[in-house]
Amino acid sequence: MLGVSLGARLLRGVGGRRGQFGARGVSEGSAAMAAGESMAQRMVWVDLEMTGLDIEKDQIIEMACLITDSDLNILAEGPNLIIKQPDELLDSMSDWCKEHHGKSGLTKAVKESTVTLQQAEYEFLSFVRQQTPPGLCPLAGNSVHADKKFLDKHMPQFMKHLHYRIIDVSTVKELCRRWYPEDYEFAPKKAASHRALDDISESIKELQFYRNNIFKKKTDEKKRKIIENGETEKPVS
């Protein structure tokens, strides 16, 4: 009897530990899955400064990158690189580019830089690989469709890591300007420094404004109308 009792106790002990290990494994697996889903919701914010907008002849001279979560909280600040370009290209820029890039100090910084386009792509690709899963997170920015053209051409490996969709703040801006002009009047004004990192920060703040003052407000109004009409709010499918 003693042997059976001891054996039973031993089996129960092993089974209990297995149960604990199994529960821990499920818990850790769920946490990992939740973390993966959260990372998939991140946004890759990019801003470029170029020598112009002609995709056939102009080049990238500055690039910055920030990562936010879906609520627009900044999670990581990536490289902010000045990319070397030949003096002939800088000399052939439009008067607008010469004025603004000269005033901001960017033209001088480009002439002094030793960073190549290939080195820049490697740095940015390494950064986004650390912060986002492949193929799931969209490119975000202001008029970012223009940046995307240059990135597709000059940094294809970087772009392959991102989702094919984009989040363009300028689209939201133009819709709000037309649909909610009273609210749009209070949108944050851009300082127009024409430096990549400053422009990204301004774009994030601008989208935060639209989210907090227009998207949220309209959602709250809809909920109030549903309650006033005595309707049951339908769950989102």
From Swiss-Prot:
This protein's UniProt keywords: Acetylation, Cytoplasm, Exonuclease, Hydrolase, Magnesium, Manganese, Metal-binding, Mitochondrion, Nuclease, Nucleus, Phosphoprotein, Transit peptide
Active site location: 194
Domain of life the protein comes from: Eukaryota
One cellular component term from this protein's GO annotations in UniProt: mitochondrial intermembrane space
Pfam family, one: RNase_T
SUPFAM superfamilies: Ribonuclease H-like
Site, as annotated: Important for dinucleotide binding: 53, 96, 164
GO MF terms, alphabetically ordered: 3'-5' exonuclease activity; 3'-5'-DNA exonuclease activity; 3'-5'-RNA exonuclease activity; magnesium ion binding; nucleic acid binding
Residues bearing PTM Phosphotyrosine: 122
InterPro entries per the UniProt record, alphabetical: Exonuclease_RNaseT/DNA_pol3, Oligoribonuclease, RNaseH-like_sf, RNaseH_sf
Compartments, as annotated in UniProt: Mitochondrion intermembrane space; Mitochondrion matrix; Mitochondrion; Cytoplasm
Disulfide bond annotation, renumbered to this chain: none
Exonuclease domain ranges (all copies): 43-207
Entry EC number(s): 3.1.15.-
Subunit structure of this chain's protein: Homodimer. Homotetramer.
Matches recorded under HAMAP family: Oligoribonuclease (MF_00045)
The family this protein is said to belong to: Belongs to the oligoribonuclease family.
Function: 3'-to-5'exoribonuclease that preferentially degrades DNA and RNA oligonucleotides composed of only two nucleotides. Binds and degrades longer oligonucleotides with a lower affinity. Plays dual roles in mitochondria, scavenging nanoRNAs (small RNA oligonucleotides of <5 nucleotides) that are produced by the degradosome and clearing short RNAs that are generated by RNA processing. Essential for correct initiation of mitochondrial transcription, degrading mitochondrial RNA dinucleotides to prevent RNA-primed transcription at non-canonical sites in the mitochondrial genome.
Protein name in the entry: Oligoribonuclease, mitochondrial
Native source species: Mus musculus (Mouse)
